[in-house]
Structure formats: C-alpha cells, structure tokens
C-alpha cells in the first residue's frame, strides 16, 4: 500500500501455498490491492515467473536456507531480502542483492529504489547468478545442459 500511495506501479505474483494464504488474501482485500496481487498458489514450474520479474522480494521474519532465493539467484533475478539469518547468508547487501529491515517502510523504500534503478537491478542479477555458480559450480548442469 505504501508503494501504491507513492505512485509506484507494481504487480505482485505470490507463488506457493501456505498456512497464511487466507490472512494474506484478507489483508489484500482490506487494503484494496486486489488488482495488484495475483495469488497463484502452487505452480509446477516457477521459473517463468522468476524470468519475468523485475525484482524478487523475499520478506520473512525467519528463514533457513531458502530454495526460492537460490532459484532466483541462479536465474539472475535482482533480489531484495529481509534481514534475518538465512537471508543474510544467501545475499550480500550491496553486492549481489539488497538486504533491509522487515518493516513496511524499509521494504517499500528499498523496492522503490530498486525499481527506479534498472542498472542496479541488472548488476545484482548478474552478480547473484555468478555468486551462486562460484559457490556451487555443479548447479550449472541442472539449468544449462
């Protein structure tokens, strides 16, 4: 809602199922954001969504090693994550993505900054894929044969 109030146009695709889906749906409706959010549920192949995104946002209070963040990295998505243990281990702030506090103001400010800076998003996307390939060179065979 903060982004919409600032005039930032964004469409959110939410993939996956979870116990908070109904809570999220109610929040979307309460804030009048029905046209801005698309809740797709579980999808067989999430990669086309990663490929089309301008920014992958992973805002969570707690996280271990996130497979979704790894997928976004290998597919070259610019990434914004919230500041928690697992996320900090996967994304180096200002190097291969951006890390911010998990507050509406901080997340919305970072999203706005990144959406306005295409060059920075491209840098983060390239670096995130490179970083993952350096860490796990064998992963390349899973995506490119």
Give the predicted meaning of each segment.
Residues 25-41:
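Nucleotide-activated donor-binding/catalytic signature segment of Leloir-type glycosyltransferases, i.e.
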Residues 42, 61:
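Aromatic "clamp/platform" in nucleotide-sugar-dependent glycosyltransferases that forms part
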Residues 93-94, 98-104, 113-118:
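Conserved acidic donor-binding segment of nucleotide-sugar-dependent glycosyltransferases
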Residues 134-145:
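C-terminal alpha-helical cap of glycosyltransferases
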